[in-house]
Amino acid sequence: MSENDSSESDIEMDPEEEKVYRRQVEESDGFDVDYFRYAGIKPCPLKDENAYTYDIELFGRLGLHCYNLLHEGTNLKLMCIPKYNTNNIGVSSGDYYYITLEAIDTYNNSPCTFQTYVSEWYQTSEHGYLVVETYIARLKGPTGPHNTCIGRGWIWGWEEEAIDVYYKGKLPKWLTKDLLAAAKDEYYVVQESDILENEWLHLYAEIALYSNWKWHATRKSCEESPHLKLKANNAIFYMGFKGSGDHHPSGKHVEYQTIVRKAMDGKPGHIRLEVDSWQAIPSDLIGEDEPP
């Protein structure tokens, strides 16, 4: 391969630039880094704090959702995203984002600056399979020397052993009426009041719809009441919904079916969503046929 065929990632940085770059990464965990042409982490220029794309908004909201789950008595909501960085680490099937956002705690009307480190990667499947993971979900702290550099995978990496095997591997098939009837004690049917009270259910549906656009049952426990399954750390959601901006040639709204598997390993800032989503026929809702 000639020099002209080399990619930027194959070209070494100037030693002095690399020294500054590494210091910035270590002191900010990758969130506050200047532009260096041959660096892995690069800032993405935004015209203003509202010029971010829809996927970045979704991932920022997922980071807030993760934080709210782990910090009782908080309800952080997104206000704007002033900056984010991308990480080119040579993984062709995935993207990594360091997102800095402004949020407000609706419980006490207190504003804050928030940081979340998120990855999205996808696999080939019959419909479209997306995995979104957070590694950091935190209030922004002071920048400076510390011992929690994101480059140390043992700090931010996932504890896979902490996740039950039921919530790993291939996603389950769509929940048919027969399966639901045979194991009704294992599942909780989400009520309309649940949807109104838990905005994160809308977030899961939006991420599922995003995965569909881009890539054209909770486990039984005798100690757990059905309603508590909705907020379990590890859960599987079977969702049917309509895209408000999508219309079938017949004039009807397009309906979607989605399986979302949520997993948490107990470490701060960690939540994983595995999403499989597909377009359904108008009568194809939960309790009916499997996906085509």
From Swiss-Prot:
Disordered: annotated segments: 1-24
InterPro entries membership: MS5
Bias-annotated ranges (Acidic residues): 1-17
Similarity comment: family membership: Belongs to the UPF0725 (EMB2204) family.
Record-linked PANTHER family: CYSTATIN/MONELLIN SUPERFAMILY PROTEIN, PTHR31260:SF32
Protein name: UPF0725 protein At4g28920
Species assigned in the record: Arabidopsis thaliana (Mouse-ear cress)
